Design a protein with these regions (language model features):
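Active-site segment flanking the S-adenosylmethionine/decSAM binding pocket
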Residues: 1-53
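Rossmann-like AdoMet/SAM-dependent catalytic core
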Residues: 41-165
């Protein structure tokens, strides 16, 4: 739709799969949630499930959505340029290539996304559904047996987190 100025996607789960179905240049500006726990180097997402619920997928609430690299790469294919994230580093901002010259922003290098994934949000849960405030590698360790889709190959591959981290 050529009339959409701002599009925001934050469904705590299958954001990547929704983006995949959208047409190119679907808005001028897009804000897309990503999972900072997945880091900056892996191009991964959770598998598609129609009624995805992050707390049911894993009790910790840490295995959901897609990595920033996965979101960035699909947005490039849709005609967008990554311009940064919010302060909590969980929402990525993109501008359509058609409008990027109308704003005076420094465009980040896509090869170095590391500084955009160090989230200061600590929302992990214990098996008793209590906040556990995990950070760093402890977050990956607790979700190591969760299935994800590795999008870095020509044919996406279903793996467990422990297979790629």
């Amino acid at each position: 739709n050529k009339n959409i100025d701002l599009f925001s996607l934050d469904v705590d789960g299958i954001d990547y799969w929704i983006l995949k179905e959208l047409p190119k240049n679907f808005s001028k500006i897009a804000i897309i949630e990503f999972n900072s726990t997945f880091g900056s180097e892996k191009e991964i997402t959770v598998p598609y499930k129609e009624n995805f619920d992050r707390s049911k997928y894993h009790y910790s609430n840490l295995c959901y959505g897609a990595s920033l690299k996965a979101i960035n790469n699909i947005m490039k294919k849709k005609g967008f340029i990554f311009i940064g994230t919010n302060l909590h580093r969980v929402n990525a901002f993109f501008v359509s290539k058609k409008y990027i010259n109308k704003i005076g922003l420094r465009i980040p290098k896509n090869k170095d996304l590391k500084k955009y994934v160090d989230s200061n949000i600590r929302e992990s849960r214990s098996k008793n559904n209590l906040l556990s405030y995990l950070s760093g590698k402890k977050k990956i360790q607790i979700i190591k047996d969760c299935e994800i889709i590795d999008l870095s190959k020509k044919t996406p591959k279903r793996l467990k987190i422990k297979d790629i981290f």
